[in-house]
Design a protein with these regions (language model features):
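Solvent-exposed soluble domains appended to multi-pass membrane proteins
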Residues: 1-352
Length: 352
């Protein structure tokens, strides 16, 4: 499959709902409130509606209440034929915010099989729950170890390292979800559903880990069981630049006939519809994003909801006007100004 290693969600206060909107429409989320709550009555051209024009049956599934983020209303507006929310599932195992991902996927397989049996073409969105903060009881469902073992004085000892830390809980939760997705794909394959199917996996927003979480992870010394002091020569300072850019989320496009390839071109959520659209034979005239497979020179511009932007060459911080170099080359003012204008146009103008 295709792994996009430089992918960012472009969310505002609507977090998950912003991603569902941006993914579906290739439009930026609202700067005032959230689209799902404040602008749910507007008409949007979406990937769901475009596929329905090609006779796809379109559905969504989520183990949470249907009214959360106004999904029961907005999913219909996006073009879904049916939204299977909490009431469609047996809540037999709860972790974190609700129905566990393991149970969710297990129950989803026969539902998808029935859809596959009744519809020649289908498109489905499955929204998970477990891998979401605060991961309070992660040890109940994940046995993944985030401790660190070392040899001291000829003795093999284990230090706690990330155990019982926020970032450690997150890593354990990710491992659980990874296993759940793997089992889900295996079960779909057993039902013969994967032979002509594309699976898209994305993270709807970053984990919202703090800078202190990263500093602890990078600077923990297992030999002393302490964190390095900032004046230690081995201390890794997490700069504001590093912290702001360490918010990538996964994006994977997989099918049995797609060869494995990593794509590191900067990509945002608004680029999904044009990219998938090129593969599926659909396009939206309102899309603000780009087909990432056909970006000139691989220099895409990722615009964030606060006005900052990222390219393959620089990161521009809108709050203070700072520019952080990414590529080892001289960048002229024209390059910067052009992208500042482009950033404004994404929010306030039509695509040019």
């Amino acid at each position: 499959g295709l792994y996009f290693s430089n992918f960012y969600a472009q969310v505002g206060v609507g977090t998950s709902s912003d991603t569902e909107f941006t993914y579906s429409t290739s439009l930026m989320p609202s700067l005032n409130g959230t689209v799902f709550v404040n602008y749910y009555n507007n008409k949007y051209e979406t990937i769901q509606k475009l596929l329905k024009e090609k006779d796809y049956y379109v559905f969504s599934m989520h183990g949470n209440e249907g009214n959360f983020w106004n999904r029961d209303v907005m999913h219909k507006n996006l073009g879904y034929d049916k939204f299977y929310s909490k009431s469609s599932f047996i809540i037999d195992e709860e972790y974190g915010l609700g129905l566990s991902d393991g149970s969710f996927f297990k129950q989803a397989v026969p539902m998808i099989k029935e859809i596959n049996d009744n519809h020649e073409l289908f498109y489905g969105t499955l929204i998970t729950l477990t891998n979401h903060t605060p991961w309070a009881k992660v040890n109940e469902y994940s046995e993944y170890k985030v401790s660190k073992s070392i040899t001291v004085g000829g003795q093999y000892i284990t230090r706690p390292y990330l155990e019982d830390t926020t970032i450690g809980k997150y890593i354990k939760s990710v491992n659980y979800m990874d296993k759940c997705i793997g089992t889900f794909i295996e079960e779909l394959d057993k039902e013969g559903i994967l032979d002509n199917t594309i699976i898209v996996i994305y993270g709807d927003h970053d984990a919202r880990l703090s800078k202190k979480d990263y500093e602890y992870m990078y600077n923990y010394d297992p030999y002393t069981d302490k964190v390095l002091n900032s004046d230690d020569e081995n201390y890794h300072e997490v700069t504001n630049y590093e912290y702001e850019l360490n918010r990538k989320v996964p994006f994977i496009i997989w099918s049995k006939d797609i060869k494995n390839k990593e794509i590191n071109t900067p990509m945002g959520m608004i680029d999904v519809l044009p990219t998938l659209g090129n593969m599926l034979g659909i396009s939206s005239k309102y899309a603000l994003g780009n087909d990432i497979m056909n970006i000139k020179d691989g220099d895409n511009t990722i615009v964030f909801n606060n006005g900052s932007y990222l390219t393959s060459k620089i990161y521009y911080n809108s709050r203070n006007g700072d520019i952080y170099p990414i590529a080892n080359e001289v960048i002229n003012n024209e390059y910067i100004t052009k992208r500042v204008v482009y950033t404004g146009c994404l929010f306030f103008c039509k695509k040019y």
